[in-house]
Amino acid sequence: MDVSEGGVTVSVPTASGGGEGAADDVFFNATQELNRDLTVATLAAFREREPRAASYLDAMTASGIRGVRAANAGWDVTMADVDADAVELATSNLARNGLDGEVVARDANSLLHDHDRVLDVVDIDPFGSPMPFADAAFANARNLVCVTATDTAPLCGAHFESGVRKYSATPRNTNYHAEMGLRILLGALARTAARYDVGVTPILSHVSDHYVRTYLELDHRATDANAAVEQVGHVYHCQQCLSRDHEYGLVAAPRAECPRCGGHQVLTAGPLWLGPAHEEAFAASVREQLTREMGEASQAFHLLQTIEGELHEPTHYDQHRLYSQWGEPAVGMAEFLDQLRDAGLRASRTHFGGTTFKTDGGLAEVEAAVL
């Protein structure tokens, strides 16, 4: 069947039930249109930031729709897949749109280690964890690595042992599980890049539906790698009163008791990324690159607008969860945030949920401001 998206039309597999999906081992995910719209807009914004960036690798291309859209936006595209049917389909989709590009039947790691190729932007969008491809990406990409992770249960700690194995970290299943997953992923990626003397800067990150997506700008100096590793640390979360604090460093110092309530159910999470997960100005520039032909432009616009205003403090709170903990009825979010600001705290909404917020104050300060 044919799908039109972002100014291109491609053939995609038809699942056995007649819908869009997987057939003959070639996968197409219609629900990832937001992800692809944001990818194209991010590539456009990044090219303004780094005009020399020209080449783009869609490392797990499947139907090729992401790579075709990148080629349509003017990128020198290479599309790769280990499946011969996917390579044939992606090649056909490039041709039917009158676009140039190369489609190769190669494993992503093998292709990335081919030093005859210069790849400015590498896009890793596997099914599951991206970590098996992270070393090759950071060792060989020049400017930008784009990463999707769909294994959100291991990342957020719901599948604890799997998260420990895949990300060499301790993820904890908290009421801010989406941000936990994002920061566990960023921490693992930063540590991987540092092995190759590459420093990463997250210029845009988001958690949408059941995936985590981040765009990491690269700097190829050991000092930059050191600086990125310095943004990694641990979060200490009290299961009883929901307070938490954090500290930088790869060595954890577990808390015997909560400094706020004196409870002894304090979880240690990490190593994870404690630094900013986005740059406000870059998020704004991505928003400016959204076009009417993008099917999820409206959702992308509002997502980016929220991210622009989101504070960088690690870990958000859920307002409804706090009021439930306090045994009080929740007020409206706008009123709630105004109360925090009136008390001298910085506060913002977050893109992690409609009742989530960030603040530079501790939980005791939040409680004093609103109760």
UniProtKB/Swiss-Prot annotation:
Residues 1-370 form the Trm1 methyltransferase domain. Its EC number is 2.1.1.216. It is an enzyme of class 2 (transferase). Pfam families: TRM (PF02005). One of its GO terms (biological process) is tRNA N2-guanine methylation. GO terms for molecular function: tRNA (guanine(26)-N2)-dimethyltransferase activity; tRNA binding. Coiled coil: none annotated. Zn(2+) binds at residues 238, 241, 258, 261. It catalyses: guanosine(26) in tRNA + 2 S-adenosyl-L-methionine = N(2)-dimethylguanosine(26) in tRNA + 2 S-adenosyl-L-homocysteine + 2 H(+). S-adenosyl-L-methionine binds at residues 36, 66, 81, 107-108. Keywords: Metal-binding, Methyltransferase, RNA-binding, S-adenosyl-L-methionine, Transferase, tRNA processing, tRNA-binding, Zinc. Dimethylates a single guanine residue at position 26 of a number of tRNAs using S-adenosyl-L-methionine as donor of the methyl groups. Belongs to the class I-like SAM-binding methyltransferase superfamily. Trm1 family. This is tRNA (guanine(26)-N(2))-dimethyltransferase. It comes from Halobacterium salinarum (strain ATCC 700922 / JCM 11081 / NRC-1) (Halobacterium halobium). The lineage of its organism: Archaea, Methanobacteriati, Methanobacteriota, Stenosarchaea group, Halobacteria.
